[in-house]
Amino acid sequence: MAKKVVGEIKLQIPAGKANPSPPVGPALGQRGVNIMEFCKAFNERTKDMGSFNIPVIITVYQDKSFTFITKKPPVTDLIKKASGVEKGSDNPLKNKIAKLTHKQVEEIAQLKMEDLNTSTMEAAKKIVMGSARSMGVEVVD
């Protein structure tokens, strides 16, 4: 018989840097999950993913065991890395802070394809370009 799911927790944790301090500790502690066991497993799985924030979905079962799924880094983090900026523009309509090429947009869309709710590359590129536009990053040829 399958284990009974008692909760699902969604977090964004820096790759390879999960520790029991907030937000990880309190989120897992209130569900009764072994926090250090999760931290070790997460850090092991994400140690080669650079310094990105990694979205993770943790499924907690009735017997206090858990499974987790890691996703690709957020599109905004990938855009910031590709364009070399620290954060998005405070006024994206007036202040363009960086430029991305269509090739860079395609690389980001390719990387995020499995996490996006689309099946075509064109739609994925539009999603990435929309995120870039809202950050004040201009897409050029």
Curated annotation (Swiss-Prot):
Is rRNA-binding there in the keyword field? Answer: yes
NCBIfam families in the cross-refs: L11_bact (TIGR01632)
**InterPro entries to which the protein is assigned, alphabetical:** Ribosomal_uL11 (IPR000911), Ribosomal_uL11_bac-typ (IPR006519), Ribosomal_uL11_C (IPR020783), Ribosomal_uL11_C_sf (IPR036769), Ribosomal_uL11_CS (IPR020785), Ribosomal_uL11_N (IPR020784), Ribosomal_uL11_N_sf (IPR036796)
What family name appears in the similarity comment?
Answer: Belongs to the universal ribosomal protein uL11 family.
Q: List, alphabetically, the SMART domains matched.
A: RL11
Q: Which organism does this sequence originate in?
A: Helicobacter pylori (strain G27)
Q: Name one GO molecular function term.
A: structural constituent of ribosome
Q: What is this protein called?
A: Large ribosomal subunit protein uL11
Q: How is it modified after translation?
A: One or more lysine residues are methylated.
* HAMAP family xref list: Ribosomal_uL11
Whether Ribosomal protein counts among this entry's keywords is yes
Recorded hits in Pfam families, A to Z, give: Ribosomal_L11, Ribosomal_L11_N
From the UniProt record, give one GO term of the biological process aspect.
Answer: translation
Quaternary structure, per UniProt, is: Part of the ribosomal stalk of the 50S ribosomal subunit. Interacts with L10 and the large rRNA to form the base of the stalk. L10 forms an elongated spine to which L12 dimers bind in a sequential fashion forming a multimeric L10(L12)X complex.
Highest taxon of the lineage: Bacteria
Q: Which UniProt keywords apply?
A: Methylation, Ribonucleoprotein, Ribosomal protein, RNA-binding, rRNA-binding
Example of a GO cellular component annotation carried by this entry = cytosolic large ribosomal subunit
Role = Forms part of the ribosomal stalk which helps the ribosome interact with GTP-bound translation factors.
Xref: CDD domains: Ribosomal_L11
